[in-house]
From Swiss-Prot:
Organism, as annotated: Legionella pneumophila (strain Paris)
Protein name: ATP synthase gamma chain
Keywords: ATP synthesis, Cell inner membrane, Cell membrane, CF(1), Hydrogen ion transport, Ion transport, Membrane, Transport
Gene: atpG
Pfam families: ATP-synt
Main location: membrane
Sequence similarity: Belongs to the ATPase gamma chain family.
Bilayer topology annotation: Peripheral membrane protein
Length: 288
């Protein structure tokens, strides 16, 4: 029965692993729901800030803030948002593939690229493949605040202010649904204009601003970009938890299939051992 005992030991070991992956799946599902709530809660605030920016920009039409001014693009900055931990399927590898494709496309058109990295996996990746890294941050946890990564954002905003970069983008995983997450590259600076902005350009209310519209615009535009980065980080965390939940569910299901296979092998081994014992008893009786 040595074979049967070994199989039973393997079944016990796999069953313990299955309990762990099942628990991790449930934890990831809970974290994903909480992150989705934070993601939804921040969007109305961001939309309202953008509306205010449009109103203020119209009120101070003679003043063109650098964040809203187009200029010749020679050097591009990109903020890459990744995870700190693994066990989330191909989430990071898909993001890295899209990031490298985007960077190479810019470089083929004669543009230099500066990079800021959020997340430990991104830091490890760019240490391996190289790149001009201006700043990085990791260990943000599952509930980050804007203050946690404001230093990295400020580095890129200062680079834009000083003319070191001429546009700023962010790449992160977009949450489509629980089963689908995809890499997404978004332009942050100069502030892109939507079709709706162009249509409503001549229709606006007149407001009196205190302090001056210029001072407000200088402050609120920076806050808006920080909020855009925050939304990208939170959405990436939601994607991480969704991918982790799916990966752990797959691991749990695979463990269940393995247990069934080993259980069948155990039953066969036990049956063979019993048959052998019966044959020995019958053989011994016949000898008597």
């Amino acid at each position: 029965m040595a074979g049967a005992k070994e199989i039973r030991s393997k079944i016990s070991s796999i069953n313990k692993t299955r309990k762990i992956t099942r628990a991790m799946e449930m934890v990831a599902a809970s974290k994903m729901r909480k992150t989705q709530e934070r993601m939804r809660a921040s969007k109305p605030y961001a939309n309202k800030i953008y509306e205010v920016i449009k109103h203020i920009a119209r009120a101070a039409s003679e003043y063109r803030h650098p964040f809203m001014s187009e200029r010749e693009i020679k050097r591009i900055g990109i903020i890459v948002v990744t995870t700190d931990r693994g066990l989330c399927g191909g989430l990071n590898s898909n993001l890295f593939r899209e990031t490298i494709r985007t960077i190479r496309n810019w470089q083929e058109h004669g543009k230099e690229v500066d990079i800021a990295v959020i997340g430990r996996k991104g830091q490890a990746f760019f240490r391996r493949v190289g790149g001009n890294i201006l700043g990085s941050i990791d260990h943000l946890g599952d509930t980050p605040s804007i203050n946690d990564f404001i230093g990295v954002v400020k580095i890129m905003l200062d680079a834009y202010y000083n003319g070191a970069i001429d546009s700023l983008h962010i790449v992160y995983n977009e949450f489509i649904n629980t089963m689908t997450q995809k890499p997404f590259v978004k332009q942050l600076l100069p502030l892109p204009k939507s079709e709706e902005d162009k249509k409503t350009l001549g229709h606006h209310w007149d407001y009196i601003y205190e302090p001056e519209a210029k001072e407000l615009l200088d402050e609120i535009l920076e806050r808006y970009i920080e909020l855009q980065v925050y939304q990208a980080v939170v959405e990436n965390i939601a994607c991480e938890q969704a991918a982790k939940m799916i990966a752990m569910k797959s691991a749990t299901d695979n463990a269940g299939d393995l247990i069934k296979e080993f259980q069948l092998a155990y039953n066969k081994a036990r049956q063979a051992a019993i048959t052998q014992e019966l044959a020995e008893i019958v053989g011994g009786a016949a000898a008597l």
